[in-house]
Structures are given as C-alpha cells and as structure tokens.
C-alpha cells in the first residue's frame, strides 16, 4: 500500500509538466534564457510541434513552396525560416546562414545544422525539416521507377561549413567480376577532375543509374546490366532493396532481384573514373533517409582553392580542405570518406594520427584506430573501426582513387587528379602544413 502511495506524486509530476511553459519561449524571452532540452522534453516538443507545423501547408500553397524540401530554392528556404520565426516568435536567427537551397540544407545533417542556430531555435527548425522530408518520402514501387523523385537535383555551391553528417552514399550496384588491382602507382592511368565533377548519386532504394543521352554520347564507354545475385563483401557493392547480413558481416546488404534489369546502368570508361567517389558504403546502417536523391552533373567554376579563397569562415583554425566545403564544391552532398581523409590531412591538429609522408599525395595512418573513430563519429557510426574503414579504402583501389603503398603498413596514396580539382599541388599543401618528409624515405 505504501508503494502505491509513493508512486502517485511521480505520476502527477509527469502529467502536469507544461509544454508551453518549459519548451516555448515568450516573445520577450531571450534565447539565452531558454533551458537546454532533455530527451524527454524533446519528445514532448516533437509531439506538440507536429500540430503547429501543419500550418505551414497553407504557407506552402500561398507561396508555391514545393512539398519536398530537397527541391527548395534559396528563396523557399528563406520563406520557410521566416514562417518559423513568426510562428514561434524565434529570436537570434541569422538569415545569412540560410543562404543555400533545400538540397544543401537537408544534406547538412542534424549536428551541423544545430551548430548554426541557437539551441532551441535549431531544434525547432530541424524537427520541422525532418517531418517535411518524411512526409515526402514514398515507398519505392516494385517495378523500379520512383516518380516522386526526379532524376536530377541541384545542390548549393554555398555549402561551406563542415560538421557531422548522417547521410552516406552506396557503391555502384554491380561489378562485372572481381579484378586484380595493382599497387604500383606508376602503372595507373591519369584521372581527370572533369570525371570527378560528373558524379551522379544513386537514387533512393534499388540502384538504377542512368546517364543523360548527351553525356553518354560524349564518352567512350562500355555498358553492363545489373546481375541478379547477392554480392559478396569482396567487391563492396551494395543495393538499397533490403537490409541483411553477408557472411556474418553486419555491415553489408544484399541486392534483391529487380523486375526491370534491361536498362543501361552506370557506364565505365577505359580509364579510371571518379563515379565511385559518391558511393562509399556506410557500413553499419542503411536507413532510407540517409540516401539523397540523384544529383545532376555539377561543374563549379574554378578550383576548390578559388571556391574557398574569400570565404569568411575559412581560417587558420580550420582544415585547409574542410570535407563539407569540398562536398559542397563538388556537389556530392553527404561527406565521403576520401573527402574526410583530405580534411584530416589538411588539419595540423590531426598530424599525430594521420599525415602526409612528404612524397606527393602519399599519406600514412599513424593511428588507424583514431582515424576510424573520428570517421565513425562524423557519420554517427559508433561501431566503426579500422577493419570497416579499410573496406572503404579497398573499394577505392578498384576505382584508382586511392591505392595502398606496397611494403608499407598503413600507407596509402591518392592516385587521382586531385591537383586539378583542388587547385593545390601536394608541395603547396605540405608547405602550408609544415610537412617534413618521413625519415624512412
């Protein structure tokens, strides 16, 4: 009987917690006075806000704002923020930080998004953005084509701030067969920066990649169709159709048979291609919201060096090549492993666990576990380790993007044309980072 009496005050406290008092600021309240959200209060806020967010539908209809945030222009993003500011009496919102289109906004990821806004404001805006994206998501039809998603989506060239990203792309749907990869740098074909900038995403769900007819005609290519079979971990190709395990590995999926496999898929030229740069596996989970829709060819003006030269938020305290800035420049959306490695390699504070060797684009993982830990933190994959990270690196071998240096442990080399893309020679980067050639060299 006593236990029942003790339980009543606890239940009463939970039931009488006021959402409008604890969670919503009054018009004259400064953002600094708003208490930090707890997991329980965030859940309550989520439930309370859903009803309020429904009012945005009228604003969308009035201003012609697309239902899918991925299709928003910079003007649509600004209108959305303005609506939220007026609806919730938000303060401390810097509209200049929203100078991007919807695709870039959605690609930021939650933590990066929240870093740009005051605590409470960021949670409200992110909650609404997630709801809008989930409402727009449609189940992928069995016959293969998702009409709700266009084949092309443009991304912003303003995507400059770097932070944690939750999205990750997947590798191409199928190789024709495994091939032997040489580790000799001298035997590689050159890879042009134009190939990197002609990247396409795999669409949500089953992977069917099509080139535009004009683009196809301009390349000497060989085509192949998707094989209806389960892919082994060796070739690191993953589908989007189902979640599963292969050979005891909890980080790979199987490819389901498709009804329509007679369509031409990803083309491969006689030389190595950067097409694969957008399709590094995310290893531990494949949630549908982690996959952006297909992007068009994106060819920015100038080099990455030109792109960031006058950016105010590029300073000595940040890496020379922030991964998110590089992702925005190339139009890749979510940060990829090769971009993340370049970020670490151009950050002086990371030289204790990853650094250039001083020999061109060669680099060494002095502490591979720390590199893997940071990659897992960036991608919100707590189970990430070097074994899983190395699978991603091995995937790059086949595309002549990164190769393992023979005879050296944890030593790799970028073998693609980074100089044309970045606008930096390796020697320039070494000088900026005070890199000294390894004594072993």
Swiss-Prot record:
PNT domain boundaries: 51-136
Activity modulation notes: Autoinhibited by a module composed of four alpha helices (HI-1, HI-2, H4, and H5) that flank the DNA-binding ETS domain, reducing the affinity for DNA.
Span list, region Activation domain: 130-243
Molecular functions per Gene Ontology: DNA-binding transcription factor activity; sequence-specific DNA binding
DNA-binding region ranges: 335-415
Keywords: Cytoplasm, DNA-binding, Nucleus, Phosphoprotein, Proto-oncogene, Transcription, Transcription regulation
Cellular compartment(s): Nucleus; Cytoplasm
InterPro entries: Ets1_N_flank (IPR045688), Ets_dom (IPR000418), ETS_fam (IPR046328), Pointed_dom (IPR003118), SAM/pointed_sf (IPR013761), SAM_PNT-ETS-1 (IPR041886), Transform_prot_C-ets (IPR016311), WH-like_DNA-bd_sf (IPR036388)
SUPFAM superfamilies: SAM/Pointed domain (SSF47769), Winged helix' DNA-binding domain (SSF46785)
Entry coiled-coil feature ranges: none
Keyword field contains Transcription regulation: yes
Stretches the record annotates as Helix HI-1: 304-312
Keyword match Glycoprotein: no
Helix H5: annotated span: 426-432
Family: Belongs to the ETS family.
Protein function: Transcription factor. Directly controls the expression of cytokine and chemokine genes in a wide variety of different cellular contexts.
Designated name of the protein: Transforming protein p54/c-ets-1
Source organism per UniProt: Gallus gallus
Taxonomy of the source species: Eukaryota, Metazoa, Chordata, Craniata, Vertebrata
